Amino acid sequence: MENARPAPGEELSPGAETVPRLAATVILLRDEDGLEVLLAQRNPGARFMGGAWVFPGGAVGAQDGEGEAALRAAAIRELREEAGVRLPDPAALVAFSRWITPAAVRIRYDTWFFLATLPAGAALEIDGAEVVDARWFVPGDALAAADRGEILLVFPTIKHLEQLSGFGSAGELIAHARRQTVAPVQPRVLGTGETARIVLPGEPGYTR
C-alpha cells in the first residue's frame, strides 16, 4: 500500500549498514473527545520527513546522560523544545514501543516511544523552526485525514496510530503499556526507488 513507503528524504544506503542512533519520542495523550494524541508537523523545508506529522521526539544527546535515564531525559527535552510541554519528571513516561530503522536506510535510529499524559494546565507552544504546527487528533481521525491527503504521515506514525485507535482512554492505554514487555521492531525495505516498500516482521517478504 502507499503508506508502506520510506519517508520523504529517507535515503536508502548503497553501502555498508550504518549503526542506528538512539532516539526518544513522546506519544502525548489527553482525554477530550475520547482518547487524543498530539502530532507535530515538521518544517516542510526540512530535508528529512519535511511536512510530516509526527510524535514529538529526537535523538539522544550528550547532555541527556547515559542508559535508560538518557532516553527519558531526551524525551522530556524534545517535548519541551518542540511543543512547549514540560513533564514533571521521568517517571511520567511509560515505555510503549521500540522501533529500529530498517538496515537498508542510510540514516538510522533506535527509537523508544514513551506514553505520557498532558499535565494539568499545560499549553502547547511550538518552536516555529523544526516544528511549525501541532494539533490534537483522535487516532482514527488522523489516519482518515492522511487517507484524504490532508496531512502527511510516515510509516511508524501510521502503525502506532492504528494501535492507539483500539483504546478508549489514556488510562486504559497506559495500563496496557505497563503490563507489556517492550520488544524491538525492525521493519525491512523491499525493492528500491519507486518500488520500495516497508514490511514488518511476520509479513510476506520479510525473511527474504
Q: Whereabouts are the PLM-identified features?
A:
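N-terminal leader/linker segments that precede catalytic domains of diphosphate-processing enzymes
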Residues: 1-131, 135-208
